[in-house]
């Protein structure tokens, strides 16, 4: 009975994750996943708090994955139960949980080791904390200690494999964004067993460096942290045009990741070659960013040559679809805003804490707002109409929810276009920044392709 409940619950969460929460989920190079029954330790980068374990959990088909996550997220009882139900285990860290808490790691690591020896999959984040940017931090070697000590318990007869994995997001915080999980070629620890018997620390360092290099090769790692904000803004604005020059659709996350890596590498080269010129460019881009954020503009509006007739056409579409939007708002307006109080709290905390926003939104939606409000809709339909209509409405709720989300997004886009179309003709400030953006793009084109 417990197994049936787990299967149903996990598949329910998979639907919420892959269909409702994310627009697209990309799982790349699945052929690198070792065959079922082979002990596999997944090592992944960690940038998005609770979303990273969820992304891994739903990337291995029906295989159960035991995942280590920071222990402090288990302090809330309801969240702890949710995480345990998904085989997510607490990993204690001295700098966060205190030295006394580390004793708990032995119990958890032993349990994970047994799962490995039985041919299971265990996942861990070697950075030991989530980053708040596209950057790969330092790796702890604790996961390798666990892997080799587990192999030693079986007299090194089990070949444990490390599967380097990269996780990447189009947007850390927004629903209906994209997520990507990419697997590298696994590393067989058996080839290190003999050397480990005499020089364990040497082996840990060698394997750790190899795992980190493999993950670094797959992910977007912006190493110039002093200029991170400028580089990240450039890849999200100029980077769209850069992708198109490479013949890539920037709306395709795997392809955009590749062009972002090329762009960021080129920016690093230019900084080494022309530090003063790049410092000026970064400064100007940050000023452009400040203007767009202040005016609540998206970068794409600068490239939109909208005429009045096109705006009228868009307005007509919005008006015609308004009744359906109003109908679709029930109950989705409550689902969309249910997590707001909690997410605002994490946003105000800033730093790595803001990376909990997406995970909190997912947990609140999956465990509370979606099942409660969807069931409420079904009951109300059943009372006032009939069973057939209630079932049809229930089955259409996810489609209506997506429609409500994209209608709202289309409306915001329409209002932004109206504002920009109005201001660009009357505001010298808008004209200045439109011209400045064009000059910056031309400058980067010249530098990057020279």
Predicted regions and their residues:
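Long, charge-rich alpha-helical interaction segments
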Residues: 209-301
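Amphipathic, soluble alpha/beta structural segments
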Residues: 203, 207, 234-251, 304-328
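Extended catalytic-interface subdomain
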Residues: 148, 163-173, 180-185, 194-195, ...
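Membrane-proximal, non-transmembrane alpha-helical segments
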Residues: 265-346, 357
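Low-complexity, intrinsically disordered regions enriched in charged/polar residues
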Residues: 7, 201, 205, 228, ...
């Amino acid at each position: 009975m417990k197994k049936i409940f787990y299967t149903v619950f996990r598949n329910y969460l998979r639907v919420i994750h892959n269909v409702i929460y994310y627009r697209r989920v990309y799982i790349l190079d699945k052929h690198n996943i070792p065959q079922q029954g082979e002990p596999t330790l997944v090592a992944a980068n960690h940038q998005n708090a609770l979303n990273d374990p969820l992304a891994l959990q739903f990337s291995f088909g029906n295989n159960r994955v035991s995942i280590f996550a920071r222990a402090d997220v288990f302090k809330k009882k309801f969240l702890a139960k949710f995480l345990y139900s998904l085989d997510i285990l607490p990993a204690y860290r001295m700098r966060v949980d205190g030295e006394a808490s580390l004793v708990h790691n032995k119990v958890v690591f032993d349990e994970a080791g047994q799962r490995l020896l039985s041919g299971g999959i265990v996942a861990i984040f070697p950075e030991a904390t989530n980053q708040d940017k596209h950057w790969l931090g330092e790796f702890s070697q604790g996961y390798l200690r666990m892997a080799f000590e587990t192999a030693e318990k079986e007299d090194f007869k089990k070949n444990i494999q490390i599967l380097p994995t990269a996780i990447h997001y189009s947007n850390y915080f927004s629903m209906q964004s994209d997520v990507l999980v990419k697997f590298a070629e696994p590393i067989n620890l058996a080839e290190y067993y003999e050397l480990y018997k005499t020089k364990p620390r040497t082996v840990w360092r060698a394997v750790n460096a190899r795992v980190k290099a493999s993950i670094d090769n797959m992910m977007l790692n912006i190493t110039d942290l002093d200029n991170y904000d400028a580089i990240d803004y450039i890849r999200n604005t100029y980077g769209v045009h850069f992708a198109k020059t490479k013949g890539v659709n920037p709306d395709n996350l795997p392809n955009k990741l590749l062009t972002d890596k090329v762009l960021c590498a080129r920016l690093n080269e230019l900084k080494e070659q022309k530090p003063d010129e790049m410092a000026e460019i970064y400064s100007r881009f940050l000023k452009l960013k400040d203007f767009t954020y202040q005016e609540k503009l998206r970068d794409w509006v600068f490239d939109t040559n909208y005429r009045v007739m096109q705006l009228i056409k868009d307005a007509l579409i919005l008006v015609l679809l308004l009744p359906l939007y109003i109908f679709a708002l029930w109950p989705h307006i409550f689902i969309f805003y249910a997590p707001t109080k909690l997410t605002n709290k994490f946003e105000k905390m800033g730093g790595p804490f803001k990376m909990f926003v997406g995970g909190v939104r997912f947990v609140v939606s999956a465990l509370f707002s979606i099942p409660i409000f969807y069931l409420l809709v079904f009951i109300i339909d059943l009372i006032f109409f009939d069973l057939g209509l209630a079932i049809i409405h229930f089955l259409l709720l996810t489609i209506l929810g997506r429609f409500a989300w994209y209608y709202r997004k289309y409306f915001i886009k329409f209002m932004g276009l109206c504002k920009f179309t109005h201001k660009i003709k009357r505001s010298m400030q808008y004209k200045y920044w439109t011209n400045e953006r064009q000059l910056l793009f031309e400058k980067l084109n010249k530098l990057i392709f020279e």
